Curated annotation (Swiss-Prot):
Keyword annotations: Ribonucleoprotein, Ribosomal protein, RNA-binding, rRNA-binding
HAMAP family, A to Z: Ribosomal_uL3_A
GO cellular component term, pick one: cytosolic large ribosomal subunit
Basic residues bias (residue ranges): 228-237
Membrane-spanning residues: none
Gene Ontology BP terms: translation
Any coiled-coil regions, as ranges: none
Protein source organism: Pyrobaculum calidifontis (strain DSM 21063 / JCM 11548 / VA1)
High-level lineage: Archaea, Thermoproteota, Thermoprotei, Thermoproteales, Thermoproteaceae
GO molecular function: rRNA binding; structural constituent of ribosome
Name of the protein in its database record: Large ribosomal subunit protein uL3
Subunit structure: Part of the 50S ribosomal subunit. Forms a cluster with proteins L14 and L24e.
Length: 338
């Protein structure tokens, strides 16, 4: 028997095509069904400010360090309140089973900054639109709100808001969801209204862009020895595939790297604060600025560059052994940004 040669393929076909994301604002395709006993939004949006390290009391009962202080790397998200601009109802299309929007109601006078991104009339007849929504209350299967970020309240220094759609969940009753969504119309929602410290969330963002890269950096291809038999190149693959078929998608090839939408599951919220001065370094976060209002401390890293919009979502696949639901005890947060 000859020597068995086995090597895992380079890269993953699960993330093809490796091209730039269509929009820097993440598009969430899946939302979980949660039962909290009260209606709530299933997600929130915040801006990535930077990373710090914090001293936290380990609250995992099975950990050898249970009850002791440990150092954790944390990501700081600038989370100004979201403005609820509209309510939208969905029903099922009888021909294909897809969800289709059947009506929406906008706040009578949208914020001026919202006109930077959307073409809106001077005023909406909110009462008329709400009456029209009542006709679809019996056939509605999903309730969502259109929210706008408020970057003027962040440390970015931009004015144009991002607009995204967030479902209402927490209870199985559609009537309760509709009433809750209508009650939010024209109001703001803070991170404390959606999440609690200690819970797990999914993080969705567009990663840092790296531009056009070769196979070594893009796929981790082995660099060939620099001798005469490899005179045609060293930072390249030995072959790009057979003559037929002419194109092999499984073969590592150079191309776009980064600026892809990615989802990371089950990040734990360590703290939700109201005063960003508590955790902002003396000189501000590098390449970001000063956090003026609410913030979120997440354990671990988050995809994307500073100033990038990050969408937080209730977890779609929470672990069987979830960490304690109680609020973690954060002893100290560094004032030195990573």
């Amino acid at each position: 028997m000859g020597l068995k040669i086995n090597r895992p393929r380079r890269g993953s076909m699960g993330v093809y095509p490796r091209k730039r994301a269509a929009d820097i604002v993440p598009r969430v395709r899946t939302w979980p069904e949660v039962n909290l006993g009260k209606p709530t939004l299933l997600g929130f949006a915040a801006y990535k400010a930077g990373m710090l390290h914090a001293v936290v009391v380990d609250d995992r009962p099975t950990s050898p360090l249970y009850g002791k202080e440990v150092v954790k790397a944390v990501t700081v998200l600038d989370a100004p309140p979201l403005y609820v601009a509209a309510v939208r109802l969905y029903t099922l299309d009888p021909t294909n089973g897809y969800k289709v929007a059947v009506g929406e109601a906008w706040v009578s006078e949208p914020p001026a900054d919202l006109r930077r991104v959307l073409t809106l009339p001077e005023k909406f007849d909110t009462e008329k639109q709400l009456k029209a929504l009542e006709e679809y209350r019996d056939v509605a299967v999903d309730v969502r709100v259109l929210v706008a970020t408020q970057p003027r309240l962040s440390g970015i220094g931009k004015k144009t808001p991002e607009v995204l759609e967030i479902p209402v969940g927490g209870v199985p009753s559609i009537d309760e969801r509709i009433n809750f969504a209508i009650s939010l119309l024209g109001k703001t929602v803070s991170p404390k209204d959606v999440f609690t410290p200690g819970q797990l969330v999914d993080v969705i963002a567009v990663t840092k862009g790296k531009g056009y890269q070769g196979v070594v950096k893009r796929f981790g291809v082995t660099i060939l020895p620099r001798w005469h038999k490899h005179r045609k190149g060293h930072r390249r693959t030995g072959t790009i595939g057979p003559q037929a078929p002419a194109l092999m998608f499984t073969q590592p090839r150079p191309g776009q790297m980064g600026f892809h939408q990615r989802t990371e599951y089950n990040k734990r919220i360590l703290k939700i604060g109201d005063n960003g001065a508590e955790i902002t370094p003396k000189s501000g976060f590098p390449h970001y600025g000063v956090i003026k209002g609410p913030y979120i401390l997440l354990q671990g890293s988050v995809p994307g560059a500073r100033k990038r919009l990050v969408v937080l979502r209730y977890p779609v696949r929470p672990p069987k052994k979830a960490p304690p639901a109680a609020e973690p005890q954060v002893v100290w947060v560094s004032s030195q940004s990573i």
